[in-house]
Amino acid sequence: MIKDTNRYRPARGTAGLALLLLILLGCAGYYVYAGYYRHDIFRELPAADAGPERPAIVMLSGDMGNRVGMTPKVAARLNARGYAVVTVNSLSFFSPRRTATEAAALIGGAMHRAEALGKTSEVVLIGQSFGADMLHAGLAEMPTAARRQIRAVVLVVPGHDIIFRASPIELAGLETPDALALPTASRLTWVPVTCIRGAGEDNSLCPEMDMPNLRKVDLPGGHRLNGDDAALTAAILPAIVQPRSE
């Protein structure tokens, strides 16, 4: 008697499709949570100790948004030290492709929020990964008068090139870069700059930068810095506490 060996295949195929659907729904749900579908751009962390004697902080998140990754953890640590912090959800703002001029406007708006929140006229700008790329690209387009409130700029694991769009395609490394990073980053000669990279990181902008106003910091790990938000916060703090020299 010949057995029908094919009768269970549809069931296995259906199970495979169901699993794939669950994975896709999970990914979509994650991106909705992270902010790909237009969550609020800004998140404000007020501080009781805020005032004119200390700067406020603006943090541009990486391409996974300001709800996950290092940005919310570092922001919480800095806020616990008494700094008012405004985080920017780069995933939400840059989910459509933007320009350097639009990035500059975003930074300017975040600065105004931070100054009001921190009751101060000085800000420190921090960019994480994709946010670091957008930070130096935007600052290159910012008018001189708007730069006066910036005490320091911190670029955390910036890349060798720039893409003005945050998306799953960009995250997977499948998007064609829009520009090299060095031409705009090297224009940050008017403000103290800190460039932080992972010691095992490839494709980092930091080794390419060479300016007298630049401080370089190597931390253990690759692009994700071993997820050590305490070490990253410690590397950022000197840029915050040191007064800007005119």
Predicted regions and their residues:
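N-terminal Lys/Arg-rich, disordered targeting/topogenic segments
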Residues: 1-12
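Hydrophobic membrane-insertion alpha-helices, especially the h-region
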Residues: 13-31
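C-terminal catalytic histidine-bearing segment of alpha/beta-hydrolase fold enzymes
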Residues: 209, 214-246
